[in-house]
Amino acid sequence: MIIVFLTLSTFYIALLLLQPALPQPFMALFKTLPIGLLIVMVLKARSQLQNRTFITLLLALSFSALGDVLLALDTGQLFIGGLAAFFVSHGFYIITMLPIKNWRLDVVLLYLFLAIIVFCLFYPNLNEMLIPVLFYMLVLTIMASFTWMTDKSNGFLVLGGAVFVISDSILGLNRFYLEIAHADIAIMGSYYLAQFCLVKGFLQATSKHK
């Protein structure tokens, strides 16, 4: 399953180098295939997952796939739809990590500090995107922080949260601050790694608690 995931992820990233050779709908399809495989991984692990974890993971990945499609088809107007889809996705990841019992103020402050720095760079160019981006950064910060504090916490979860922050920071900087060479490669490579680590982390945590 890991080999297939790596193959699908690498294939899409390679396709990015060919743009605009493929029409947007095809790019959107290939973009979502690695996330579709993660959904299959969760479905195969159904017997080892609690009902809430199973449902919230499926919803988190499904909204991620929707966000992928909207961003792949983005002509400007669909960006906020993609942002909203990922906002909901992070919300379901957060629910999956509840309850939080091991509060870590140092982790929260670190992620808040990083979010403030990045937001200050975005701010002059956000305009009507100010509120949506602010709320998205807040939920992303909470999700990444919770990977340290949930009783399901493990190396995969922590890495997944951190790499998701890196991926979205590159995306935001490229869109709202300055154009970054080969940003799409860096964004998608880190994004696929983050999603894989989050799913792997949740599945590993569930196995550990059985």
What feature does the model see in each segment?
Residues 1-210:
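Polytopic alpha-helical membrane-helix bundles and their juxtamembrane interface segments
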